[in-house]
């Protein structure tokens, strides 16, 4: 990144931010789809039942913890790879 001039660094940063937003939206969409499909079963009311609310809360917490854990593993692997390459 040090080899890039200021304009190139700015463009690179913009691309990184766009990718992060895209990844976040993919994560969020996956969370909504999965938890809705697994938890919402009663379409006779526009409100969630207490059972559905509880299920969605547990589902979203589990999904986010899993995603966080996967991210940590990627960081660990990248660090190990970086050390292996002599960085």
Curated annotation (Swiss-Prot):
Disulfide bonds join 35-59, 39-55. SUPFAM superfamilies: Tim10-like. Pfam families: zf-Tim10_DDP. GO terms for cellular component: extracellular region; mitochondrial intermembrane space protein transporter complex; TIM22 mitochondrial import inner membrane insertion complex. It is found in: Mitochondrion inner membrane. Transmembrane segments: none annotated. Keywords: Chaperone, Disulfide bond, Membrane, Metal-binding, Mitochondrion, Mitochondrion inner membrane, Protein transport, Translocation, Transport, Zinc. GO terms for biological process: protein insertion into mitochondrial inner membrane. One of its GO terms (molecular function) is metal ion binding. A motif (Twin CX3C motif) lies at residues 35-59. It comes from the Eukaryota. It is a peripheral membrane protein. Belongs to the small Tim family. Heterohexamer; composed of 3 copies of TIM9 and 3 copies of TIM10, named soluble 70 kDa complex. Associates with the TIM22 complex, whose core is composed of TIM22 and TIM54. Interacts with the transmembrane regions of multi-pass transmembrane proteins in transit. The twin CX3C motif contains 4 conserved Cys residues that form 2 disulfide bonds in the mitochondrial intermembrane space. However, during the transit of TIM9 from cytoplasm into mitochondrion, the Cys residues probably coordinate zinc, thereby preventing folding and allowing its transfer across mitochondrial outer membrane. Mitochondrial intermembrane chaperone that participates in the import and insertion of multi-pass transmembrane proteins into the mitochondrial inner membrane. Also required for the transfer of beta-barrel precursors from the TOM complex to the sorting and assembly machinery (SAM complex) of the outer membrane. Acts as a chaperone-like protein that protects the hydrophobic precursors from aggregation and guide them through the mitochondrial intermembrane space. This is Mitochondrial import inner membrane translocase subunit TIM9. The gene is TIM9.
């Amino acid at each position: 990144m040090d080899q890039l001039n200021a304009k190139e660094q700015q463009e690179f940063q913009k691309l990184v931010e766009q990718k992060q937003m895209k990844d976040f939206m993919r994560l969020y969409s996956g969370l909504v789809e999965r938890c809705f499909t697994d938890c919402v079963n009663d379409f006779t009311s526009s409100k969630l039942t207490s059972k559905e609310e509880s299920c969605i809360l547990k589902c979203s917490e589990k999904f986010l913890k899993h995603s966080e854990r996967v991210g940590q593993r990627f960081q660990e692997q990248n660090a190990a790879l970086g050390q292996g390459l002599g960085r």
